[in-house]
């Protein structure tokens, strides 16, 4: 059956269109965009008062599948994605076994056929994330990987990283770099600063991120190949990326809503749900990241969706790093950046829908006739309080718990079919 979205406010930065319009979907593709479309036989959704954008692409998630499915799996992760208007994700390789071979890639893609989002695997740079033996990038790309990364760990050896960047480029993939000097981290669990000192816990100096970010930029510039910097959180890394991009280095980067909304002051609660990697930084860093979003230094907003079971998050100092984010990313971005006048809806769509797909060279991200019908429909003005118990993710470790966010996903369309309706599990 055809699907007709009536009276919505359509925002499509890929085409530049913004305004009231109807969208008619036939099979899995957009057939027509215009005013007063009539399709009596179609399933009709009244989108009056709602905003219609391309489905969001989150290019940085952890679905824990295979190997840690007590935290999340591809199906529950897909449910969380659909509830957040996310129709495509890139899942990181720190699974068990690692995504370092075609067999694991095939397992993920086969299971993802039943998920309520499109799942694109990211292969690992080195075997088992060990940092020593490089994977076969041609094999991974042929199997279905869209990028490579040792995310969760840095590639410590600069020679291996340089070789990986070149080989990935010629294999048709980007390297996504987790920028962290583990020797500087040295067991730290939160940002090094006044709060960590007052709490008496070991801090992570911002240099741990800045040094490796600068290394990756230098390699990209010298080798004349691309690099994508994951989850940027510090003011200095932001400035280094900005400067490099202006001088023509092929560097792109991403950040997550918690890095432009929250600070390490929240760690005073000694609640491990505010611990992630990289850690929450200072108000000055939040301002710098926000400026990077505004001036287009930052290309993408992602979540780094990292589920952990409640018992694993119980002990503040021993808990693993990571927070879930798929169901809050759009609302958090609307709250912090759109409703405060810092960015437009066009810019939001570019950050969350267009650029991630461009960087990964995957389809979607626009609402033109002929395009795949992956669509997010939301009420930009509806306020709601984040209740972890109501999240669709298997894990509930959200750093936005108890916060009031403005903007709520009402429907998600995947491949021409409604896969999520607000209020209906």
Please annotate each region the language model reported.
Residues 1-55:
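Histidine-rich, glycine-flanked metal-binding segment
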Residues 8, 315, 372-425:
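C-terminal cap of metal-dependent C-N hydrolases
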Residues 8, 23, 28, 49, ...:
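Divalent metal-coordination and catalytic microenvironments
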Residues 50-112:
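Metal-associated gating/positioning segment near the N- to mid-region
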Residues 62-71, 90-102, 122-134, 149-160, ...:
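Divalent metal-binding segments
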Residues 110-125:
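A glycine-rich helix N-cap at a beta->alpha junction
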Residues 134-301:
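Histidine/acidic residue-rich metal-binding segments in metalloenzymes
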Residues 198-226, 273, 294-301, 306-381:
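His/Asp/Glu-enriched, well-ordered alpha-helical/loop segment
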């Amino acid at each position: 059956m055809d699907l007709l979205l009536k009276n919505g406010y359509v925002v499509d930065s890929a085409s530049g269109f913004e305004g009231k319009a109807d969208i008619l979907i036939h099979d899995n593709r957009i057939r027509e965009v215009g005013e007063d479309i009539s399709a009596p036989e179609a399933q009709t959704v009244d989108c009056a008062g709602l905003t219609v954008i391309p489905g969001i692409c989150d290019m940085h998630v952890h679905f824990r599948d295979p190997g840690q499915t007590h935290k999340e799996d591809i199906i529950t992760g897909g449910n969380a994605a659909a509830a957040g208007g996310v129709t495509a994700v890139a899942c990181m390789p720190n699974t068990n076994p690692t995504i370092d071979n075609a067999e694991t890639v095939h397992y993920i893609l086969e299971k993802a056929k039943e998920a309520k989002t499109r799942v694109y695997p990211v292969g690992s740079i080195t075997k088992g994330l060990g940092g020593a033996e490089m994977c076969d990038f041609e094999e991974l790309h042929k199997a279905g990987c869209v990028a490579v990364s040792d995310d969760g760990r840095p590639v410590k050896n600069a020679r291996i990283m340089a070789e990986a960047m070149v080989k990935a480029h010629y294999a048709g993939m980007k390297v996504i770099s987790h920028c962290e000097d583990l020797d500087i981290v040295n067991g730290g669990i939160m940002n090094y600063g006044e709060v960590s000192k007052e709490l008496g816990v070991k801090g992570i100096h911002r240099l741990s991120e800045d040094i490796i970010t600068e290394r990756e930029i230098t390699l990209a510039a010298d080798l004349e190949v691309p690099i994508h910097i994951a989850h940027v959180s510090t003011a200095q890394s932001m400035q280094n990326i900005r400067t490099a991009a202006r001088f023509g280095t092929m560097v792109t980067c991403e950040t997550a809503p918690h890095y432009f909304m929250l600070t390490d002051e929240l760690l005073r609660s000694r609640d491990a749900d505010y611990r992630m990697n990289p850690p929450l930084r200072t108000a000055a860093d939040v301002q710098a990241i926000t400026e990077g979003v505004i001036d287009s230094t930052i290309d993408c907003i992602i979540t780094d969706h990292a589920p952990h079971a409640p018992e694993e998050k119980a002990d503040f100092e021993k808990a693993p790093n990571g927070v879930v984010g798929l169901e809050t990313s759009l609302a958090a971005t609307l709250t912090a950046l759109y409703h405060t006048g810092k960015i437009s809806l066009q810019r939001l769509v570019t950050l969350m829908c267009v650029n991630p797909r461009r960087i990964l060279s995957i389809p979607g991200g626009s609402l033109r006739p002929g395009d795949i019908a992956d669509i997010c429909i939301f009420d930009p003005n509806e306020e709601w309080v984040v209740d972890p118990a109501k999240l669709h993710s298997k894990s509930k470790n959200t750093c936005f718990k108890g916060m009031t966010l403005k903007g709520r996903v009402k429907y998600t369309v995947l491949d021409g079919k409604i896969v999520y309706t607000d209020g209906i599990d």
